[in-house]
Amino acid sequence: EDGIRDQPRSRGLGDVYKRQLYDTCQKFDNIEFLNEWYITSIVHDGKQFCGITAIETLSGSFYTIKGKALIIATGGAGRIFSYSTYALSSTPDGLDMAYRAGMALKDMEFVQFHPTGILPSGILITEGARGEGGYLLNKDGDRFMKNYAAGKMELAPRDIVSRSIMTEINEGRGFKHETGEDCMKLDLRHLGDEKIKAKLGGIREISIKFSGIDPADEPIDIRPVCHYMMGGIH
């Protein structure tokens, strides 16, 4: 539960969608997968789509592929930010390719930042950590969200929490991560080892694997990370 929902969500829904789509496509003989290919441009005659140019990354060979229709599903451009929950492949190249072909881009200024990305990787620590009662702390040990959203505290909407964290950092109340980056602390210790393992086992595993921190023993280093881009091809 967080500040903008009154019912808890299930985790891993995106992975279920991807698996179902992939499994369904595998059932059709007329769908060909070109894995590890990189599209470089859209080919058109000024009026209609004609095909694409692409590189097979394993061989470095360049190809032109004819086509009658194109669906661009390259995702957002989250990797333009230093800290992002996006996959390394989520660069703006798909958007750039469409723009160079004359397509309009829309609402590109609307970017959502998730308040709790783990340092140094930027991997997401979900709202579940705060939904179960986790605290956000500045270097003075204060639950600083009381100064920005006293009614919701850590369960305030993402944009409010993200801005609050950056305000604390910019005003000198942040921690210094070993990488030199400024951050805040997400403290789960008061929840107890048993609850953390039962309710937040996935978060604990991520924290141990990617930061070397067991949240049952010490707070997690976090900062806002690019999480979602509302804009795209119009």
Each predicted region: which residue ranges?
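An anion/pyrophosphate-binding glycine-rich loop and adjacent beta-alpha core
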Residues: 97, 103-227
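Core beta-strand elements of the Rossmann-like FAD/NAD(P) dinucleotide-binding domain
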Residues: 60-69
